[in-house]
Every structure is written in C-alpha cells, then in structure tokens.
C-alpha cells in the first residue's frame, strides 16, 4: 500500500481500515501456520527418535559416525545440549538435578547424557531439522523418515524442513507474512507420493509464502488425515475476502490445483 517505502508514503487511495484489516489477517494467518508447523515438528521429532533409536540406541545423536559433517555434528550437539540445559520443563529440571556438573573450563555440562527420547523433547524445530539434514545420506533410517512424511527422497525433506524452519522463525519473531519474499523456499519434488501441484511454479512464485504453505499442507496431508489446516486457511480467506491474497503468492485459479481442491 506504500508508494514510497523509503519515505513511508502511502498510495492516494490507501485507507487506515485496510491497514488494520491486513494486520489482523496476517496475525491470524501466523497463528494457523504456527499450529501446522507444530504438527510437522512433533512428527519429525517422533520419527527421528523412533527410527534412529531402534537402530543405534538412545544415544545415537552423539555418534559422529552417523553424520555427514563432523564439524556440523559437533555444533548441532552443542546447540542441542544448550537447549536442554535452558529448558524449564519439570522432567528436564529433575534430570539436571542429578546429572549437572561443572567441567574443567568452568562450564555447566552433564555427567550422563540423556537418551534421544528425553533430550529431543525440548529441541527446537531448527535444531531438529539441522540434525536430520546432517545425517549420513546412506542411512536407511534417513530415507524411512522422509517416506513416513510423504516424500521419496531425504534431500527433499531436508529442503522443505529448512524452508519451514525459516517460516517458523518469522512467526516466532512476530514478523509479517504479508507481501514477503521468502529467503528460504522448498526445493522441487519429483514423483510426489500424494496430491501436489499440477505444474512447477515460476521463480517469482517460488519466493512467495504460498509455496511454503503448500509444502506444509502436503506434509500435513501425509502425517495426519484428520488435520484442519486447509479448512482453517480457507475460512480465513473467506473471512477476509477483501484482502488480496496474491500478495502472499496465491495466484489466479490456485483453488484448481490438485492439492487445494
């Protein structure tokens, strides 16, 4: 609605009511997206814990042999432990009371590391997605997790998780989705297992929130048949019918796309 962003000048026909309406639209959109991301996050966490713990034991996340890049593994492990030490969950506090010690450098650490099903409960979506991406590509469990989430290839899931993690960070910082170009976007997928888009999107379309939102819808369809993500979005668009959703990438005839029917 601005004609000059640098000088904060608005177009002549701009109305305060429209600004307020779009603000509330964006706020409600973020809540719906956050709820869907939580579903994806819980599934990713559960699948990682199950598949990898079954094969390699509860402390698999500490084994550098399971990861493609040892330096990244060291960094991600540090982040994982830091998140665990910061958590205020009761079960974490109980674990810390028994195992928290001070190392030779004076830093707090654990004398006994928790199994994956404990420490991963408080891991952030970003940390989970980075740990998954860095798993050795040859591990059958990496592919199994991708398959469980509806995708054929683990690199497709890694790319999607990275884009969704970026979306989550935008929402967590209360930043707008409206009229935004996404720095991270989902990679293209081949031979989708479920209903998807009928054609590849243009370069411009791929930068819009629509592409990430559609990837999220695909994952929700794969992991939870009873989800209401699409219904909530459609209801929001109907409630705010005067808000032009092309600004978030919903192009003409988007409802005719197989996944959105």
Regions found by a protein language model. Give the residues of each.
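Long, contiguous internal "core" modules enriched in hydrophobic/ aromatic residues
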Residues: 1-261
């Amino acid at each position: 609605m601005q004609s000059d962003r640098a000088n904060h000048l608005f177009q002549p026909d701009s109305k305060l009511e429209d600004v307020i309406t779009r603000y509330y639209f964006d706020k409600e959109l973020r809540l719906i997206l956050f709820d869907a991301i939580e579903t994806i996050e819980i599934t990713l966490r559960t699948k990682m814990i199950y598949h990898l713990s079954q094969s390699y034991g509860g402390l698999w996340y500490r084994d550098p042999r399971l990861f493609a890049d040892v330096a990244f593994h060291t960094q991600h492990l540090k982040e994982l432990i830091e998140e665990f030490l910061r958590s205020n969950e009761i079960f974490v506090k109980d674990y810390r009371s028994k195992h928290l010690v001070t190392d030779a450098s004076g830093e707090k650490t654990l004398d006994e590391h928790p199994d994956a099903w404990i420490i991963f409960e408080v891991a952030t979506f970003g940390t989970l997605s980075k740990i998954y991406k860095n798993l050795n590509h040859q591990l059958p469990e990496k592919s199994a997790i991708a398959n469980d989430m509806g995708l054929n290839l683990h690199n497709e899931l890694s790319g999607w998780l990275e884009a969704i993690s970026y979306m989550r960070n935008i929402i967590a910082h209360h930043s707008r989705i409206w009229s935004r170009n996404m720095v991270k976007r989902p990679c293209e997928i081949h031979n989708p297992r479920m209903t998807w888009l009928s054609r590849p999107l243009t370069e411009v379309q791929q930068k819009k929130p629509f592409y990430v939102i559609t990837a999220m819808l695909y994952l929700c369809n794969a992991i939870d048949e009873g989800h209401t993500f699409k219904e909530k979005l459609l209801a929001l668009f109907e409630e705010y019918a005067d808000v032009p959703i092309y600004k978030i990438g919903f192009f003409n005839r988007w409802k005719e796309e197989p996944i959105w029917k």
